[in-house]
Amino acid sequence: MSSSIKTKVAISLGIMYVAWGTTYIGIAFTIETMPPLLSMSFRFVAASIALFVFIGIRSGWASLRLTRNEFVSANFLGVLMLGMGLGTMALAEKVVPIGVASLIVAAMPIWTALFRTLDKDRPTISSLLGITAGLIGIAIIMLPGQTIARPDSGDQNVTLWMFIILLGNLCWSLGSFLAPRMQTPSNPLVLSTYEMAGAAGALFIAGMINQESISDFMDASVRSWGGWIYLVTVGSLIGYTVYTWLLENAPITLVSTYAYVNPVVAVALGIVIFNETLTTNILLGGFIVIVSVAVVVAVESAKKQSLSQAQ
């Protein structure tokens, strides 16, 4: 890797860490006065249209044509990963502190590794130890009565909403497991475009069922609009574009570090911006989760590289 590429990779990693680590703050600002599900739906409408136009101009409109199987698979993955994963997050961040939410989501590589056992892809001893420790860390974070809900959450059960975030995270992990086994577009940006479109439709329907109002979205505060625009531009467009570039130009072990760097960014911002309190169980459980994820990501990435070299 040349020095110029190394510099670009380092800058891109920094952008990805900031873009995705700060999305939790963006969501928190957005849902202050915007309906959670509709705001996420319209976020993906805007982002998918922008990506569609960008890809069409850069690579030609023919590159956006999909087979029926590719179209169905991309939309299904969008509903499962973005719709369920970020839809539940938008609902839950009304109650669950941002730092706690990010630490629960950080465990995604652990769930993905567990799903792969269904495909007779047995984890190594190191992975198994990391997975076990990660599950213990999640359990410590989610101990009932140990996490203080956000001030404006009313009397809602914070533990219940942590489990809802966990459900969304499991859906995202299941999608990550299924994606390589499905017929999807080869261009990751094209795949992201159709995933966002599928998620937008599902979240809009869910928002209507949840009796959310489009007028509430339009009449939101300046801060909520700022958060929403940030999610569209930085979280979706810049984040995904940088991520796909890194996948093509950097080792997967390096790219995968976002899984345990992002929650550190989110926890720090939660303390600075929202004065969130880190209890002992959050500190201990969070530390265990981040270390466990680092182990699992490193081991699984090394296994993938050795398999690709063997082939």
Across the structure, where does each feature detected by a protein language model lie?
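Helix-capping/transition residues at the boundaries of transmembrane alpha-helices
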Residues: I31-E32, E93, K120, Q183, ...
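Specific transmembrane alpha-helical segments of multi-pass solute transporters/efflux pumps
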Residues: A19, T23-Y24, F52-V105, I140, ...
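Helix-helix packing/entry segments at the starts of transmembrane helices
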Residues: M40-F42, L82, L86, V100-A107, ...
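Hydrophobic residues within alpha-helical transmembrane segments
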Residues: I11, I15, S41-A46, V72, ...
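Structural signature of hydrophobic alpha-helical transmembrane segments
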Residues: P35-I49, L91-M108, V158-L170, R223-T233
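Transmembrane alpha-helices of multi-pass small-molecule transport proteins
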Residues: I31-M84, P109-F115, L170-L178, S192-E212, ...
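Membrane-interface interhelical linkers
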Residues: M1-I15, I49-L77, K120-L129, Q146-L160, ...
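Hydrophobic transmembrane alpha-helices of multi-pass small-molecule transport proteins
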Residues: L51, A107, P123-I148, Y260, ...
